[in-house]
Amino acid sequence: MSLIMALSAAASPIPSRPEKRCGWLSNPTPGNWWLRDRQAEWTLGTQGSEPVPGMDDLPDMSTKGWVETNGSHGYGCACLTVTTDARTKEVTRIISGGPVPLRQCRADRRLPRP
């Protein structure tokens, strides 16, 4: 029994610590959301999947600039405090966040373009 518990504990992901990530927040089509920062592209949600916890609590992201590329869908610049799974590059929880001016992302030369 203790072997089973040890193996299941080893297979369980270790929860990450909250971290602030800033970059391009993309919503190209309904239900699809990514945040691209200097380190990676982080998946927040994909069409047909359950939204990541905290997603519904985010404020309107189009208040500080939003580039529409597909109807009301598009991208903007945002800072989010999140927990992540570094292996899968998925956001596991959104703690807080909000839009920031587009110029912040545009000025960051180490940030890939959306």
Model regions and ranges:
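Beta-strand-rich cores of mature extracytoplasmic or soluble domains
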Residues: M55-P114
